[in-house]
Structure formats: C-alpha cells, structure tokens
Amino acid sequence: MDEIKPKKEENSKRRRNVKPICRETGDHVHYLPTCKTKPKPTRTHHAPPPILDSIFKVTHKPHYYECRKNHAADIGTTAYDGCGEFVSSTGEEDSLNCAACGCHRNFHREELIPENGGVTETVLEVLKISSCQFRRIFCSPYGGGKSEGKKKKKEKESYGGDPIIKDRFGGAEEEEGIVKRLKTKFTAEQTEKMRDYAEKLRWKVRPERQEEVEEFCVEIGVNRKNFRIWMNNHKDKIIIDE
C-alpha cells in the first residue's frame, strides 16, 4: 500500500505537466501567458465656457431698511414700531440687533445694493479668461464680421435695357464679386411691338430666324436676351387670356 501511494502521486504530477495536443496537427499547444490589460484612461469633461455673468462678477452689499416685526400679532392685529432703518448696535456690519428698535436684523427689509452705492452703476470684477474662451463668447459665430449694411440693395432704375449692370467705379461690391441684377422695364410702345412680333413668331424663336430677331431688337432698342426672356414669361399668360 505504501508503494502504491508514491506511484499515484507521480502519475498525478505527470498529468499536470502534460501539455495538451492539438487534434488537427498533433502538436503540443502552448498557452500564452495572460497579462492584465490596463484600464483605459477616462477623459475628463471640461466645463462649458463661462457666460458673461461669470466673466463680469457683480458684487453687492446687503442693506436693511424699515422693521417689519408685528408687535400686535398676539391679539390678531398689525402694529409696527416705526423703525425706518436698521442701525447696528455695536457699530459693526456683522451686528444682528438694531440699536433703534432692538429687533433682530431679519425683521428688517433687506435689499442688495452695489458696493459703490449707485443705482445704475455696478462694480465689475474682470476675471481672467483664455483667448479661446474670449473668441467663443465675443466673436461672431459665422466668421464674417461684416455689417448688414453691405447687403445687396435693390435698385429700381432702368439703364438702356441692359439686364445686368455692374459697378464700374471700383466699389466694394465689385471687389467682392457681387453683380447687381436689375429688373428690366419696357415702355408701352416696346411692349406692344414685342407682343405683335411674338405672335408673328408664334411665341417661339427658331434658329433660321435668329438674324431677323436680332434686327427687330436693335430696331426697338431692346436686348435680344431680354426679348426672349419676356416672350417666355408672357407666352402662357397671353395664351390663357385669349
């Protein structure tokens, strides 16, 4: 029995040391040493940029006025002692009792007043802010920085029948590449002639009649492109009216 026990212990040790064999290749399987993964660092969420109230800190000072203690509350009526303003009994700001009426400071009406004593003026303490926070708060979010006065202005003038008029005097709008497009106006005589000629063309300009249309436009003083635009805009309207 004593010899059997050491044999069993040797067999159990061998089984522990035996490495597993892969069924497909027949090789011993080597396990890689397990390593503990390091936890990912957590990102700290920064607070949003401060608003104007935090940039300009307004400091106030409490001031106590008339006493509102009801001395006749026990008998069901109202009676005040007539004290119009809290007076410190010790001459210090931290005093809690009024020297005039003897009541506690909480019975007096409290009002916050700026430290400089003014009504409209306030004491502003400018806090330190970074340049990035300054841009977020004070700079334009659209990145333009241009005033609204530089927008396109609508003009109601007609200039020789040309549909597009550019600023030829080196204005700001020409530098920015802005082209003013004006609405072309025609006289009653031009409108009547264009209508008669459009009916003659059956409201369509064919390629073989391009030169004829050009001569007609020069004769009445209208740009050929304007005439075609006018004809396309009024073709359906005139046909419906008829």
From Swiss-Prot:
DNA-binding region per Swiss-Prot/TrEMBL record: 179-238
InterPro entries reported in the protein's UniProt record: Homeodomain-like_sf (IPR009057), Homeodomain_ZF_HD (IPR006455), ZF_HD_homeobox_Cys/His_dimer (IPR006456)
Tissue: Mostly expressed in flowers.
Site, Required for DNA-binding: residue positions: M231
Keywords: DNA-binding, Homeobox, Metal-binding, Nucleus, Transcription, Transcription regulation, Zinc, Zinc-finger
Annotated spans, Disordered: 144-166
Zinc finger motifs (ZF-HD dimerization-type), residue ranges: 64-111
Basic and acidic residues composition bias: residue spans: 155-166
GO cellular component: nucleus
Cellular localisation: Nucleus
SUPFAM superfamilies the record matches: Homeodomain-like
Domain of life from the UniProt record: Eukaryota
UniProt-recorded Gene Ontology molecular function terms: DNA binding; protein homodimerization activity; zinc ion binding
Main location: nucleus
Residues annotated as signal peptide: none
Pfam families per the UniProt record, alphabetical: ZF-HD_dimer (PF04770)
Written domain comment of the UniProt record: The homeodomain differs form the typical one by having namely 4 instead of 3 extra amino acids inserted in the loop between helix 1 and helix 2.
Quaternary data: Homo- and heterodimer with other ZFHD proteins. Interacts with MIF1, MIF2 and MIF3; these interactions prevent nuclear localization and DNA-binding to inhibit transcription regulation activity. Binds to ZHD11.
NCBIfam families: homeo_ZF_HD, ZF_HD_prot_N
Job of this protein: Putative transcription factor.
Protein name as catalogued: Zinc-finger homeodomain protein 13
Organism placement in taxonomy: Eukaryota, Viridiplantae, Streptophyta, Embryophyta, Tracheophyta
